[in-house]
Swiss-Prot record:
This is Glucose-1-phosphate adenylyltransferase. Alpha-D-glucose 1-phosphate binds at Y112, G177, E192, K193, S210. It is an enzyme of class 2 (transferase). Homotetramer.
Length: 427
């Protein structure tokens, strides 16, 4: 094909129609601490009304990839419920679907042992689709990306595998798979979470990091997964095992996120790994800016989610003693701010903030009830918590440390369990 044909919209559409996406959503996300005690990280709420997994799912839909499998394992009930309620709008008669693929010992009597094994254990389902390409995605990152452009680059390079990548600060690179590439962006070196990562040749302060987004030729992927499954020394992980093996023998290319990111302003791209409480809080706080880097209001690339039927947000009382108001904040449906002041905060659905309370730089998850005369500063409150009248959190961190979790940046995480409120009755 000619170069212009390899980038045409019709060609990209053909590629996306011949692709199945697998979203790996079985991780616990232990660095999010108590936020993932009862749910998998991809199901954690984000941005006022979404869940983290809505971003890769929406990227698939908006890119034209309409055959999607979601691989689940750890405490998947909330995630399964969300997908069943909010992602059933695809048309099966057009061979479109979002299917749940829980760990079910389909091939062997073990649960998913690694990212590659999670795909391997669903190999029979993949083969039945008769597709040309497999797009493998992490289910726990926040970003907007046109996967069609990555698929086109994969075909253009005649690649066996393509790895999406971004530049990250060198001091943070140990948390990622770090790669080295030649002048044609062919991957020549790869190390998963190195203790001493290598910098970019032309930028000593940054490293080239894998985003955990891969494109494979389908038949090639099946061969490699079988080979890896038969290797007793393998940990069955794409970053630790599959990629280091492939770069020695096959055509593995890097795809720069800047070539396919959506809605980037002034050449800046938006991609967030919200894997820690600090990163999660900061990413939510960024959304309260007048012009945030992540545009949730872009009708050309919407973020889809489950639309719960809720009444409008409501603000009541307007006098000197108590005034219901919110500034520089995201307030979701079903919220009532009753004679309280909310600033630079994100309130998810069905939150109640009662009179004389003050909320600043805080993330309040769904169905939280905040009493009267409460003060919250730089706090993340987990779903369903009830904050008693008069409680101050984020004002005296030494006192907070005795009851709650305090992050390195001084953000306070509060959950119902920490408040002695048992929402998960087992006995």
């Amino acid at each position: 094909m000619q170069q212009h044909e390899l980038s045409s919209s019709r060609f990209v559409s053909t590629l996306t129609k011949n692709t199945v996406a697998l979203i790996l959503a079985g991780g616990k996300g232990s660095r999010l601490r108590d936020l993932t005690n009862w749910t998998a990280k991809p199901a954690v709420p984000f941005g006022g009304k979404f869940r983290i997994i809505d971003f890769p799912l929406s990227n698939c839909i908006n890119s034209g990839v309409r055959r999607i499998g979601v691989v689940t394992q750890y405490k998947a009930h909330t995630l399964i419920q969300h997908i069943q309620r909010g992602w059933g709008f695809l048309r099966g008669e057009f061979n479109e679907f979002v299917e749940l693929l829980p760990a079910q010992q389909r091939i062997q009597e073990e649960w998913y042992k690694g990212t590659a094994d999670a795909v391997f254990q669903n190999l029979d389902i993949l083969r039945q689709t008769n597709i040309e390409f497999v797009l493998i995605l992490a289910g726990d990152h926040v970003y907007k990306m046109d996967y069609g452009q990555m698929l086109a680059a994969h075909v253009r390079n005649k690649a066996d595998m393509t790895v999406a990548c971004i530049n990250v600060p060198l001091k943070e690179a140990s948390a990622f798979g770090v790669m080295g590439v030649d002048e044609n962006d062919r991957v020549v070196d790869f190390e998963e979470k190195p203790a001493h990562p290598s910098s970019l040749p032309d930028d000593p302060d940054h490293a080239l990091a894998s985003m955990g987004i891969y494109v494979f030729n389908a038949a090639f992927l099946y061969e490699q997964l079988i080979r890896d499954a038969d290797d007793p020394k393998s940990s069955h992980d794409f970053g630790h095992d599959i990629i280091p093996y492939l770069i020695k023998k096959y055509r593995v290319f890097a795809h720069r996120f800047t070539d396919s990111c959506v809605g980037a302003a002034d050449g800046n791209y938006y991609w967030r790994d919200v894997g820690t409480v600090d990163a999660y809080w900061e990413a939510n706080m960024e959304l309260t800016k007048v012009v945030p880097e992540l545009n949730l209001y872009d009708r050309q690339w919407p973020i889809w989610t489950y639309q719960e039927q809720l009444p409008p947000a409501k603000f009541v009382f307007d006098n000197e003693e108590r005034r219901g108001q919110a500034t520089d904040s995201l307030i979701s449906g079903g919220c009532i701010v009753s004679g309280a002041n909310v600033r630079n905060s994100v309130l998810f659905s069905d939150v109640r903030v009662n009179s004389y309370s003050s909320i600043e730089q805080s993330v309040i998850l769904p169905k939280v009830d905040i009493g009267r005369h409460v003060t919250l500063r730089r706090v993340v409150v987990d779903s369903g918590a009830r904050i008693p009248d008069g409680m101050e959190i984020g004002v005296n961190l030494e006192l907070d440390r005795k009851r709650f979790h305090i992050t390195e940046q001084g953000v306070v995480l509060v959950t119902p369990d920490m408040l002695g409120q048992n929402l998960h009755h087992i006995r």
